[in-house]
Every structure is written in structure tokens, then in C-alpha cells.
């Protein structure tokens, strides 16, 4: 062990000198290595492998002074204690690395805590729960429970990380039946700012438990989630259908009507319109059963398509297939807004204005080499918000009296030289989109309703907590003051939607 630490010290000192890395952070890394915590040093194979495991290459480009990879809650506690002692070290926490926002799960001139070794899957048949590690991808979590005939409420693309998705709410193909992913958590194992390991659930630390459901990483670092499991049919019906842009009116009407009229909680859709540079629609259709009733998706299936991958398959297979749509090797920017689902009277005109605005924004950058743009139109039927409330609620707290529409732009491009243009366009998208929704509301075309934002879809510069109900935000602040009175996570974690 001593020889390993000596070699590591030499390596770190060399890197610190060559790259300007912090000497203090290097000492912190060596201290944890001496305590038996796994630490990756710059230029090592494990370090470089971890760095490649991001969705956006803009995050890959950030270089931490070292990567700490705890294997259990005790290791995580040691890491937190060491960072506390350093006084100034800043850090980021990584689950799946899917957020394209720089500094959320990536860092430069600081240390990265990777949860890659926290990949436990422990099923309890008696309680119908499973313990999941935050380092899992959803395809691993679902695949690990497949032979038990069980599944969990989680990501719709298999390559997304468990930790980040749950802490941000987590929309799922199963949400119509069971609410958000975070509503299905029965216990969080958490390392607090003082290094204490606690459990947060309905009876132990219940206030902490309540605000961690969709409150992101403001209160501690989760080392294990205990989640409800649900019986899963061997086969479900799902896949995607592709349409050319000539069917935009029919598709937007179908999406709007699905949000209002669908009564089958096993049915779920995602509508996306894409420019690269021509206009193509991709609609994800999922039914949690071997075959949907004929009328559930009729408004979509009757539109002529140019490609159709929908079939009977396992839920796990569907998640793996959906990974096809995770574009790799590019930089990414995202931004989002929330609208109440418009009525049939104004629905198409409002949807058209939303798509026209996205098209106008896309015109600002679509000639940049390697650029592409998509707009997701995600219906959020009131059944999801109802199930969420029945399960104890969550921080966002969408109002179950309304059907909502979640809108998200996602932009990809190749070179950092175009960053400022893309980020300006993304900001223009969500700022003007928000103004449009306010205008439609003032004109009486949309009802005046509480419209929180979906945290996992947001740009780093958006104000998640500013759109949360004031009473919920005050409750979250009270918990933060109790568990992190020195603002450790608020001031020392580089990214995320900080509560204050």
C-alpha cells in the first residue's frame, strides 16, 4: 500500500506541476487513497474511462484533479469529511453523466465524486422493494430485476443514470400508473454535510425524506435508494414511429388530445420534432402490456409513417432500443418550459406557435457544422400528478387538476467555438417560450395555473426553485438549515440547482 501511495504522490505532483492542478486537492486525493478509498489519478486508465462516460463532450473536456470512487457509504463519508477539512476544495457528484450542463456532474480544478462503484441491486420479495445504487444506469436496474418478474419506475432511455434522474423527479413510461420515479422511493441512504450516514424515509428523518423527492442534491449525497418494485409482464408493446414534417398538424393535435382524453394509465407517449436540417418527427409509444386497446394510440397509428419500430418486447429490450436515440460525440445544450395543455379550441394554434418559435430559434444556428435541434413535447396527464400526490408528493408538486405539456429544446453541435451562439439560442428559446405562455394565459387561451419546471430538463441558468410553490421552498430551506447549516453543499458543489 505504501509503495502505491508513493507512486500516486509522484504522479499527482507531476500532474500538478504540468497542468496547474491544485496542490491542496492533490493532498486530499492522496489522503483518501491512504484510507483505502478508490481514487483515479489524471492520465490513468480509470480516470480517462470515467471522463469519456458523459453524454456531452463539453463535460468530458473538464478535467478534475482526481476522481474519487467510493464503494460504500463509509467511503463516501470519508470523502465528504476530507473535502470539508480542505476548506476550499470544490467538487461535483456524478451518477450517469447524462446532464449536458457543465459542472453539474463534471468539474475542472476540483475533485469529482463518481458513484460508479455504487451499483447494488438487492431485491426484497417480502417488501416488494429493491435497493438500487446511484451509479447504476436504468438499463442495468431494469435488467437486474427482469428475472424476478419485477421492474422499477425509472428512465425511458436505458443509458441514463439512476441517481440524477430520481433526485430530479424522474419521468417514466410507468408514471401514469405509479407517479414520478422519486415518488417510488421508500428510503434514501444519505451522507450529510458533516459526514453522518442517515436514512430518510416516512418515519426516520421524514422532513428530509419529503424534500429529497425531487429536490436534487441540496441536502446530501445518496448512496442507496430503496424503491418500490412492480410486477412486470414478460412483454410490453412499444417502440417509435417516424413521420415527415408534412404531418405536423395531425401529430400536434394527437399529442394534445392524448394528454386530455387518454384514460389508460398504461399508455405513454413522447413526441419529438427534429431538424438536421430537414424536419422529422419521432414519437415514442409505450403500452405496459403485450398489446394496447385499439383506440389508445389510433390518432398516431393512422398517420402514414416512414419508419415503425413498435413491437412486442421486454421492457428491458425497449430501454436498450431507445438508447439508439442518445446521440454521442457532440456538445449539447438544453432548456425547458412548462405549459398547461391547451384546450381543443386553441390547442393547434398554440402548439403551432410553440413549434414556430423553436424553428425560429433553430434558424440561429442550424448552419453551424454538425448542429441539430429537437423539441420534445411531453404530455403530462393529470393521472401522473394524481398518482404522485397519492404517493406523498414531491418538490415540484404538479397540480392534479390540470394536464400539462413539458417542452424541451435539445441542441447538439461539434466545436466549442460555437458555444456562445448555441447557448444564446437556448436562452432565447426558454425565455421567449415562457413569455409566450404568459401571454396566452393573459389572453385567456390558457388557464392561470401553477406551472413548475421539470428539473431534469432544465438549462443550468434556469431558476428551478423560483417556480416551486413558496411553502415547499420554505420547507426545503428549513431542512437545508438543519442538515447543512454551513452551506457546504450550496457553496462547495460546483453545479446543480442550488437552494441557498
Curated annotation (Swiss-Prot):
Its main location: secreted. Its cofactor is FAD. Residues 60-232 form the FAD-binding PCMH-type domain. It is an enzyme of class 1 (oxidoreductase). It is found in: Secreted. It comes from the Eukaryota. InterPro entries: FAD-bd_PCMH, FAD-bd_PCMH-like_sf, FAD-bd_PCMH_sub2, FAD-linked_Oxidoreductase, Oxid_FAD_bind_N. Glycans are attached at residues 43, 194, 201, 246, 299, 414. PROSITE patterns: FAD_PCMH. GO terms for molecular function: FAD binding; oxidoreductase activity. It holds the Pfam family FAD_binding_4. Residues 1-20 form the signal peptide. One of its GO terms (cellular component) is extracellular region. Keywords: FAD, Flavoprotein, Glycoprotein, Oxidoreductase, Secreted, Signal. Coiled coil: none annotated. The modification Pros-8alpha-FAD histidine is found at residue 98. Belongs to the oxygen-dependent FAD-linked oxidoreductase family. This is Uncharacterized FAD-linked oxidoreductase ARB_02372.
